[in-house]
Amino acid sequence: MVKRGSKVRILRKESYWYQDVGTVASVDKSGIKYPVIVRFDKVNYAGSSGSPTGVNTNNFAIDEVVEIS
């Protein structure tokens, strides 16, 4: 079971971070579809308002991440 602080590999093929490793920021237990929030070192391509920075977190389902040691 993934928990906060776990290192995980992303299995969602359409994700920008597919096969990348990130750190679990939180796991929501309320029953939502994508409860695992993962933070990454690199940002994606979607900078906001002309800012050079993009998004570095994303939500995933439990079966879209695998914990690594």
UniProtKB/Swiss-Prot annotation:
It is found in: Cellular thylakoid membrane. It is a peripheral membrane protein. InterPro entries: Elect_transpt_acc-like_dom_sf (IPR008990), PSI_PsaE (IPR003375). One of its GO terms (biological process) is photosynthesis. Keywords: Membrane, Photosynthesis, Photosystem I, Thylakoid. Signal peptide: none annotated. The keyword NADP does not apply. The keyword Cell membrane does not apply. Its main location: membrane. Belongs to the PsaE family. HAMAP family: PSI_PsaE. This is Photosystem I reaction center subunit IV. It comes from Trichodesmium erythraeum (strain IMS101).
